């Protein structure tokens, strides 16, 4: 079943929520330190008439990595070409992309941690020396043909920075980790987005949606669209706190941003009474794949202290027992 709070993964040519995304830094809310540094680096690069150094964005899904890449393209007056690592299956696929770049272009690769080692090998000289090394033939007769590439900026995005190989990670001159948003920041984003949807969103309504959005802009914007539907059906031009609560309750998203899947996950861990449960066991119990659990369900729960991740598996924290209103033996949480 589809989850309204799920961070969906999209192919690069899909334009999910494009109309609601900011196109420049002036309209970009949150991630202030990253934004400040990027503005300086962009001004410096433009002053020297150079390409930006390669950039790596990491962090949970839905926080604005793709949006930042497009803003950088806009601010640099550069063309951006977008792809995702799973689409680059052979070294020839990457070679075709690189040889079609023009001077100053930006290449954005989403899910860059999923590049195969063979593809990474092709990328190294391209990033470092703007050169493509193509091997023709095999064995003693093999020859390497070197093709010069135009200078470009590679922007990589990943939800799993730890899965990047060290040689690839080290070739990014700028590395930024995006953090979860504060409710107040999300409320501002929602109020601005509502205007683009020809609605006015009351501040309290925006805060109500924000606190149920798992600190994630993409989820907040998705919830806003559904709340707008409830307002439209009731012929309301203003989204009120009452209407927002009604819509979100109807969607099954509680005050903490949890839906039925999150609650099932927490129930599974609390039933184990602080005994670690492995990822594969959790996936089997929830009928979900392991990647979805690690990339979609767990980041918010981990960041907010609802669960603990150990070498032996996942453990419910005290907050999980409180959320589910469960009685527990305080001895479960004694330091061992």
Swiss-Prot record:
Residues that bind Mg(2+): 66
Binding-site residues for DNA, renumbered to this chain: 309, 314
Region annotated Large ATPase domain (RuvB-L), chain positions: 1-181
Localization terms from the record: Cytoplasm
Residues covered by region (Small ATPAse domain (RuvB-S)): 182-252
Residue segments, region Head domain (RuvB-H): 255-336
Function statement: The RuvA-RuvB-RuvC complex processes Holliday junction (HJ) DNA during genetic recombination and DNA repair, while the RuvA-RuvB complex plays an important role in the rescue of blocked DNA replication forks via replication fork reversal (RFR). RuvA specifically binds to HJ cruciform DNA, conferring on it an open structure. The RuvB hexamer acts as an ATP-dependent pump, pulling dsDNA into and through the RuvAB complex. RuvB forms 2 homohexamers on either side of HJ DNA bound by 1 or 2 RuvA tetramers; 4 subunits per hexamer contact DNA at a time.
Protein name: Holliday junction branch migration complex subunit RuvB
Native organism: Campylobacter lari (strain RM2100 / D67 / ATCC BAA-1060)
């Amino acid at each position: 079943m589809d989850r309204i709070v799920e961070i969906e993964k999209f192919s690069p040519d899909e334009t999910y929520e494009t109309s609601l995304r900011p196109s420049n830094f002036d309209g970009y809310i949150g991630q202030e330190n990253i934004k400040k540094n990027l503005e300086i680096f962009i001004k410096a690069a433009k002053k020297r008439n150079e390409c930006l150094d390669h950039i790596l964005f990491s962090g949970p899904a839905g926080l604005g990595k793709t949006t930042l890449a497009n803003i950088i393209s806009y601010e640099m007056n550069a063309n951006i070409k977008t792809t995702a690592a799973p689409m680059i299956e052979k070294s020839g696929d990457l070679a075709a992309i690189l040889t079609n770049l023009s001077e100053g272009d930006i290449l954005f690769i989403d899910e860059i941690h999923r590049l195969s080692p063979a593809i990474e090998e092709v990328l190294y000289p391209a990033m470092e020396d703007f050169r493509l090394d193509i091997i023709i033939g095999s064995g003693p007769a093999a020859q390497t043909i070197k093709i010069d590439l135009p200078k470009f900026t590679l922007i990589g995005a990943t939800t799993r920075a730890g899965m990047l190989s060290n040689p690839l990670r080290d070739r990014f001159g700028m590395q930024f980790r995006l953090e979860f948003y504060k409710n107040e920041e999300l409320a501002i984003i929602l109020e601005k987005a509502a205007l683009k949807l020809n609605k006015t969103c009351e501040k309290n309504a925006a805060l109500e949606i924000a606190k149920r959005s798992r600190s994630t802009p993409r989820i907040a914007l998705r919830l806003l669209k559904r709340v707008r539907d409830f307002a439209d059906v009731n012929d309301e031009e203003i989204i009120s706190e009452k209407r927002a609560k009604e819509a979100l309750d109807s969607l099954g998203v509680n005050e903490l941003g949890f839906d039925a899947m999150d609650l099932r996950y927490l129930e599974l861990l609390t039933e184990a009474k602080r005994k670690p449960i492995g990822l594969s066991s959790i996936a089997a119990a929830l009928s979900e794949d392991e990647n979805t659990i690690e990339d979609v369900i767990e980041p918010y729960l981990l960041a907010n202290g609802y669960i603990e991740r150990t070498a032996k598996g996942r453990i419910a924290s005290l907050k999980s027992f409180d959320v589910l209103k469960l009685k527990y033996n305080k001895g479960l949480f004694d330091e061992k």
